[in-house]
Amino acid sequence: MRVLKFGGTSVANAERFLRVADILESNARQGQVATVLSAPAKITNHLVAMIEKTISGQDALPNISDAERIFAELLTGLAAAQPGFPLAQLKTFVDQEFAQIKHVLHGISLLGQCPDSINAALICRGEKMSIAIMAGVLEARGHNVTVIDPVEKLLAVGHYLESTVDIAESTRRIAASRIPADHMVLMAGFTAGNEKGELVVLGRNGSDYSAAVLAACLRADCCEIWTDVDGVYTCDPRQVPDARLLKSMSYQEAMELSYFGAKVLHPRTITPIAQFQIPCLIKNTGNPQAPGTLIGASRDEDELPVKGISNLNNMAMFSVSGPGMKGMVGMAARVFAAMSRARISVVLITQSSSEYSISFCVPQSDCVRAERAMQEEFYLELKEGLLEPLAVTERLAIISVVGDGMRTLRGISAKFFAALARANINIVAIAQGSSERSISVVVNNDDATTGVRVTHQMLFNTDQVIEVFVIGVGGVGGALLEQLKRQQSWLKNKHIDLRVCGVANSKALLTNVHGLNLENWQEELAQAKEPFNLGRLIRLVKEYHLLNPVIVDCTSSQAVADQYADFLREGFHVVTPNKKANTSSMDYYHQLRYAAEKSRRKFLYDTNVGAGLPVIENLQNLLNAGDELMKFSGILSGSLSYIFGKLDEGMSFSEATTLAREMGYTEPDPRDDLSGMDVARKLLILARETGRELELADIEIEPVLPAEFNAEGDVAAFMANLSQLDDLFAARVAKARDEGKVLRYVGNIDEDGVCRVKIAEVDGNDPLFKVKNGENALAFYSHYYQPLPLVLRGYGAGNDVTAAGVFADLLRTLSWKLGV
């Protein structure tokens, strides 16, 4: 005997009803089957709404009409698709049921209230009609059917609206029915009868519980719960799209997961099948070929040590504390007795080892009643000051990690807490069962989904996510997007899910949290109407619970740089080649570092100096290892490296500058390069990295252009006038050559910490002597590197090398996941 249960979505319309009948027929070929059905989707909600509206004097007719329509369409569809379907008979039956519903609602309207016994009798009508209709379908297909009346056969004790079945007595009653072996068995879910023979319902998820009870009473070989998902997942796929489908789990794991909010099974459903060691298979009505998830007495040892992550939202936490707690016997008992009398379920408990406080969580909906019960129970203690005023924290959620393997595997809790910490989620309370099968944390309600996602990513080793927003898609930004597109297969092989979720230029912002199409982002951005807005990006991160959002600023904008601290505070990493932020005031410089540290986010700017050369990271590594910079000299501009190299080769200054501009080494207006300000900014960044508290105004700058030269006018006029400087530079080059030296545009930090940017004459022993053609070279003289310096040399200009450096920084944001 197998017991199959089908939920409301599985019998929502004629097509699905017939699919259920097909599944029953297929299973019946392997042995006798018993089936428990829910009401069609939405019907129970309509019945509940009818009662509530009638009590409050509102019009329940829309709900009645909608429910009648659902059944009318169901019957019509079945009659069209199933030969021999008894349409007239069942239409009469359904009409009689709705006539009875309307009659009872009229009585409720006269009373102005609905007794629980009447409430129970109304809200289970949908299940009763489902069974009658399924019996009609199966009989039309030539099957013998026995319908078990749950009110007669299942004895339940408890409240009218939430009863518990006495399995021993119910087993005896069903056995006395002597069901023929060739009959298909049907029973309405959600319903039972009390000792008076009155109808009662089995509470939330009552149909699942009915199926488990029937399986226990029949000592079935298996209980199958057919639903609209393929089985039990490691967490809710709506929260984590890459949640894994579990092949199997133990009864205890299923109990823990369901208790803490997993939607597939209710804890009461598991108790009967676990008691009688009946395997339970979770299957998908829409995908019957899927293997599903098997819940049983033991688990495969090769399975995951952690089976799932679940969450319960909308909780409130009460904390009872005070000197009167310590050493006083029975305080905990009084707390929970008060909750019991108020009929409030306590979801989580935690107590300090000092006995000074005890905290517990209840559903938010019970908060007012719970507080009243606690105030009444401890009235005297609160009045006399033996207890501190009750602390009530609302809008909380409980996140739980569950798995039998946690008992023998070290480090699960550490990973759990580390994931939450790196997502900036504060833990309010912690609880762990003595079985070591689960550990739960209480967090803010708004953090629940993010908490589940980061925990799942940490524990189940799914693809590491980087959600990138690129601001500025010109030279460097465009090259970066091209590199990201080109490297997608490499990233996938490394299990890195790098999505470009947004691109922006000075005119528009284009976003897609699932990732933009990198083949045609230019066309989409050209059509976008939304302007760039920090608030919009922050809302996206919060609304979609993005795990690892990164702002990549490829502009040279001071306005964007001024928003970095806000980005960091809102949970973004910031990666940028833009030097403006790091060369703003020292106050803002410190703000950025504080915001990054406080938010546990990274501010990465390795491309600020040397483009793709690993300058900043190597300097930081040296300083972190205890080294100290004594002095520094470097060629920090690719454009000026190119220009001064061409002067060595005999080219005039004006020709060299024109060629550098044509080759793309300089800015569109070469005056930006020739002013020396770009080199000064880079030198300031290096100086600040070594701990020097300097402002940009503290850098001594010798521009390439002499002060007496008229550099006014547009770019064309400026370029035309450059030939006036050819003789001056030719003379300086000749003088240096006579001394065995060359001209280089150099940034220096001397041993006194003074920073200068100037045209320098360097000899053949200097590491900068041979640097030209757009190369950068940086010579660090330190305690560890002397008398020969640490030299970093390579191309330090160009969109591709800068974009490559930004790409490398992007990958460094993954260290929050890797723990490095």
Swiss-Prot record:
Name of this protein? Bifunctional aspartokinase/homoserine dehydrogenase 1
Assembly notes: Homotetramer.
Lineage: superkingdom: Bacteria
Q: What is its EC number?
A: 2.7.2.4, 1.1.1.3
List, in alphabetical order, the Gene Ontology terms for molecular function in this entry: aspartate kinase activity; ATP binding; homoserine dehydrogenase activity; identical protein binding; metal ion binding; NAD+ binding; NADP binding
Q: Where along the chain is NADP(+) bound?
A: 476, 507, 555, 579, 664, 667, 798
Domain ACT residues, every copy:
320-394, 401-478
Q: Where does NADPH bind?
A: 476, 555-556, 579, 798
Binding locations of NAD(+): 473, 475-476, 504, 555, 798
